[in-house]
């Protein structure tokens, strides 16, 4: 399971012109689900998202996590993160989870997040979304919890 984390001043996602999720300062996390991922990967990825230190402390060092700051978390499904781009000029989506598994694990991740953090907002799985953000820094990190072998 993959998360592309972006520290934001604000972020929002719209579907058909309607805002379905928005946060102030916090993390926009684009989420990709890979074949073979399980609920264990989702739980570990959430632990890393909430605990990853990408906010500055009083000394200006990135020593604070989202759990420390209480900022917003916007989770947006993005299956293209699981693409294989090593060859040619077109991505292969073979590594991406089938839509049913992808939706189930994204929903599980959201449920876990809502049970331990607030505020949490989300995009819509399978929808064409317009995502807007103000990247703070910019600070962007790629986190991955590989599927079991």
Curated annotation (Swiss-Prot):
Function as written in the Swiss-Prot or TrEMBL entry: An aminoacyl-tRNA editing enzyme that deacylates mischarged D-aminoacyl-tRNAs. Also deacylates mischarged glycyl-tRNA(Ala), protecting cells against glycine mischarging by AlaRS. Acts via tRNA-based rather than protein-based catalysis; rejects L-amino acids rather than detecting D-amino acids in the active site. By recycling D-aminoacyl-tRNA to D-amino acids and free tRNA molecules, this enzyme counteracts the toxicity associated with the formation of D-aminoacyl-tRNA entities in vivo and helps enforce protein L-homochirality.
Organism encoding this protein: Thioalkalivibrio sulfidiphilus (strain HL-EbGR7)
Protein name: D-aminoacyl-tRNA deacylase
Biological process annotations from GO: D-amino acid catabolic process
Family (UniProt): Belongs to the DTD family.
A GO MF term: Gly-tRNA(Ala) deacylase activity
Alphabetical list of SUPFAM superfamilies matching this protein: DTD-like
Record has Hydrolase as a keyword: yes
Gene3D superfamilies: D-tyrosyl-tRNA(Tyr) deacylase
EC annotation from Swiss-Prot or TrEMBL: 3.1.1.96
Subunit text: Homodimer.
Xref: CDD domains: Dtyr_deacylase (cd00563)
Swiss-Prot/TrEMBL keywords: Cytoplasm, Hydrolase, RNA-binding, tRNA-binding
């Amino acid at each position: 399971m993959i998360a592309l984390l972006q520290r934001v001043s604000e972020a929002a996602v719209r579907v058909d012109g309607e805002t379905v999720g928005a946060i102030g300062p916090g993390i926009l996390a684009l989420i990709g689900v890979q074949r073979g991922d399980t609920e264990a990967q989702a739980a570990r990825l959430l632990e890393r998202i909430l605990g990853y230190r990408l906010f500055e402390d009083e000394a200006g060092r990135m020593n604070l996590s989202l759990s420390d700051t209480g900022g917003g978390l916007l989770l947006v499904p993005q299956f293209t993160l699981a693409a294989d781009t090593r060859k040619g000029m077109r991505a292969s989506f073979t590594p991406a989870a089938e839509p049913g598994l992808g939706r189930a694990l994204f929903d599980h991740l959201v449920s876990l997040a809502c049970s331990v953090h607030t505020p949490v907002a989300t995009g819509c799985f399978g929808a064409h979304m317009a995502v807007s953000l103000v990247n703070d820094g910019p600070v962007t990190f790629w986190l991955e919890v590989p599927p079991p072998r």
